[in-house]
UniProtKB/Swiss-Prot annotation:
A cellular-component GO term for this protein: membrane
Signal sequence residues: none
GO molecular function, one term: acyl binding
Keyword field: Cytoplasm, Fatty acid biosynthesis, Fatty acid metabolism, Lipid biosynthesis, Lipid metabolism, Phosphopantetheine, Phosphoprotein
UniProt-listed InterPro entries: ACP (IPR003231), ACP-like_sf (IPR036736), PP-bd_ACP (IPR009081)
Name this protein carries in UniProt: Acyl carrier protein
Database matches in Pfam families: PP-binding
Length: 86
């Protein structure tokens, strides 16, 4: 029997993808770390604000508006969370 130990990055990635899928009403299977919120996932500005707020609550971090505007992809979110947790 083989067990896969998930790294912190893997756990964050999995959770962020779940949150994006839920907030944007999308199938998790279509969301990758390269997915762009507006262009690929058809999110509007309210969707992205709500997503950033949910991430702030989930991870206990603050995402200032000037930083939030730089977050365009799922991988941007993961990178931001990891930077704030270290």
């Amino acid at each position: 029997m083989e067990f896969k130990i998930m790294s912190t990055t893997d756990k964050i990635e999995q959770k962020v993808i779940e949150m994006v899928a839920e907030k944007l009403n999308k199938d998790k299977a279509i969301i990758t770390t390269d997915s762009r919120f507006i262009e690929d996932l058809k999110a509007d500005s309210l969707d992205t604000v709500e997503l950033m707020m949910a991430i702030e609550v989930e991870y206990g971090i603050d995402i200032p508006d000037d930083e939030a505007t730089k977050i365009k992809t799922v991988s941007d979110v993961i990178k931001y969370i990891k930077e704030r947790q270290s």
